[in-house]
Amino acid sequence: MNKQDVSHESLTLGRYYKQIRERRGYTYADIASDYLHSSQISRFEKGINMFSATCLLLAIQGLDMTPAEFFALMPQDQFSRHYRILKEMSHYAMICNPSDMEHLKIKGPKKQIDKIYNIIVKLAGAKEIGNSDITSQERRYVYQYLSSIQRWTVLDIQIFSSCLNVLELKEAFLFGLDILKCDDLSNLLGLHASEVKKAMVHLHMHLVYGEYYSRANHIKAELDALLDVSDMEEKIMLHVFDCLAQYKQNKDQNTLEELENCIQVLRACELSDLAKRISDAIKKT
């Protein structure tokens, strides 16, 4: 069974549990125990009652699964509304339609995560890099949020990647190193490899744009060790921005020709906005 086997419609945890139970062919009686009754499982699946943490662990154990296996099958966009909307927001940012993003803002945000999220919407809606009208207070808020993280989650990594333009280059680099060196990296890569790798590629791009070349090379070396043959998109982006970094430093004609070829490839792949940014960076060199 894999993630494609699980319906991607909006799920409550109970409905998701029911899908997994039925696909594995387990009945309530198969899962029930002295500490977990069939009626409790039924009410949980119907959304009538929530499980305690202990009951949820027993219910997962009853499926002969570990918690990691159970949640690994869960469609990633079901983990949180912020995770889901961040993906939608990325789409708007890519097609350069910032006016469509206003409706994504949370009205009267009170939670810390909601305030951070609104800052990300504001950043993504900017028409140009560095033209987002982010206040010093908002920059401080993002920095304090990221600094307070003790264990990185995939949502935190998405927030970090989305907020690079808010951070000083040195801050962004150090947060990236913290992710790459964290104790949970192997678990994060096991469940969310694509998100982690894309965030690090984004960091490398950001450091090259900011002419922080030695640090960009450090991140590239880390990525070279992480990326495998299936990460073609990430490998291409890493190559393009490595070429850009070399050209910005050496003004080599051969590197310029390679970059021009890369720009044509990006345009052919409908990444014209990124191609334009690279072209503009070359002109400013």
Predicted regions and their residues:
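Short alpha-helical DNA-recognition segment
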Residues: 24-42
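Short, charged recognition helix plus adjacent turn
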Residues: 72-99, 264
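"A position-specific structural signal for the A-helix of alpha-solenoid helical repeats
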Residues: 16, 83, 87, 117-128, ...
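Helix-turn-helix repeat elements of alpha-solenoid scaffolds
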Residues: 91-104, 130-140, 169-181, 210-221, ...
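DNA major-groove recognition helix of helix-turn-helix/homeodomain DNA-binding modules
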Residues: 54-69
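A short, Lys/Arg-rich alpha-helix, primarily the initiator
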Residues: 1-23
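Mid-protein regulatory/catalytic core that forms ligand/cofactor-binding pockets
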Residues: 109-209
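Amphipathic alpha-helical segments of tetratricopeptide repeats
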Residues: 105-106, 143-147, 180-187, 220-228, ...
